[in-house]
């Protein structure tokens, strides 16, 4: 089995999630959204092999008080072969920086959460392990006709910024699947003082 490749790593990234982050762009995506911002990463062979030394460098980069966490995007992190290449790494990051440590893990996917549920198009034997480590999941394909420059952390209005911790808690409380318990992230100060 070939190792996963990565197209780029951005240290001190302020565009792809809250705060200052290390962002890993994995290689490989079969979706081919029109006007994708990163079509260079569609090719699974693009970039360099994602090996243990690269993992170590990323984990080390998170060990600064001014770094808020890791963002995984691409390419498509949830392509089945990329999930296989990411699962151990994501669990290593979560073990090094547990929930509540102040370091968050964001993931951007062209899949909707429903496609990552059991029976879904991109659900594999490791999907649940990856989802369990995520604080935020930005889901849905980029749709040029729904492009909106005013949106934070997403390109088109169909995409959702899902608060995975709140979603997991609600799913457990209500005894339903994650996709039936979606809690959206809110960053507008209006929301912090009003219950919706």
Where are these regions (language model features)?
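Hydrophobic pocket-lining residues within nucleotide cofactor-binding pockets
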Residues: 29, 77, 142
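Conserved Radical SAM active-site core
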Residues: 2-6, 20, 35-121, 125
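Ubiquitous "structural anchor" signal
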Residues: 25, 82-83, 148, 163
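Glycine-centered flexibility motif
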Residues: 17-19, 28, 47, 69, ...
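Auxiliary Fe-S-binding modules of radical SAM enzymes
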Residues: 5-15, 63-65, 94-196
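N-terminal pre-triad scaffold of radical SAM enzymes
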Residues: 5-32
């Amino acid at each position: 089995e070939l190792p996963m490749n990565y197209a780029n790593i951005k240290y001190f990234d302020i565009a792809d999630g809250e705060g200052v982050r290390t962002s890993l762009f994995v290689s490989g995506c079969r979706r081919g959204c029109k006007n994708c911002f990163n079509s260079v990463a569609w090719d699974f062979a693009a970039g360099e092999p994602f090996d243990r030394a690269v993992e170590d460098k990323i984990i080390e980069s998170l060990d600064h008080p001014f770094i808020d966490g890791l963002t995984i995007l691409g390419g498509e992190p949830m392509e089945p072969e990329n999930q296989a290449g990411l699962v151990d790494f994501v669990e290593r990051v979560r073990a090094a920086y547990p929930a509540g440590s102040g370091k968050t893990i964001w993931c951007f996917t062209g899949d909707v959460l429903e496609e990552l549920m059991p029976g879904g198009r991109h659900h594999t034997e490791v999907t649940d392990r990856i989802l369990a480590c995520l604080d935020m999941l930005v889901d849905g394909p980029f749709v040029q006709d729904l492009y909106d420059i005013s949106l934070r952390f997403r390109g088109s209005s169909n995409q959702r910024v899902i608060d995975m911790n709140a979603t997991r808690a609600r799913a457990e409380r209500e005894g339903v699947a994650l996709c039936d318990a979606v809690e959206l992230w809110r960053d507008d100060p209006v929301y912090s003082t009003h219950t919706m």
